[in-house]
Amino acid sequence: MVLTCDDEQMITSISFQTQPSVVGIGIGIGTHAKTVSAFRAFLEQNKSPLVIDADGINMLSKNKDLLKLLPIQTVLTPHPKELERLIGVWKNDFDKLEKVKALSKEHNVIVVIKGANSITVFDGKLYINTTGNPGLATAGSGDVLTGIIT
């Protein structure tokens, strides 16, 4: 299902007439202040599991208080730059993974770090998918991953 908004310039409301079994959100919705307000209102009333990518992650990065509104086991799917915005700069790969584990634990979320070797972090554990290839660095492949997880 795809939701539309009456405002052609930005998303100003996010609502459903039915209770979805899961919601994938963030791809292409922008980060305008009105969209952030709509995202906040959605998170405050949402009862469905979430998969958050792209601009959804960017809104969480700029508004860290929104992390407290996420349902347990929400899936976040950042690429490296989105991850940096979310957890800050890291010194090395070990530091990066420690920061992601801390985020996952504090907010009870699942983090899928997209890359040549995608890494899933949850409950203090790391799961590494070594089957990736350079073809996954194609624009839109992360959007497809979000759809598959959703």
Predicted regions, residues:
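Short pre-catalytic strand/loop immediately N-terminal to key active-site residues, enriched for Gly-Thr
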Residues: I128-G140
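Short, small-residue alpha-helix embedded
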Residues: R85, T138-T150
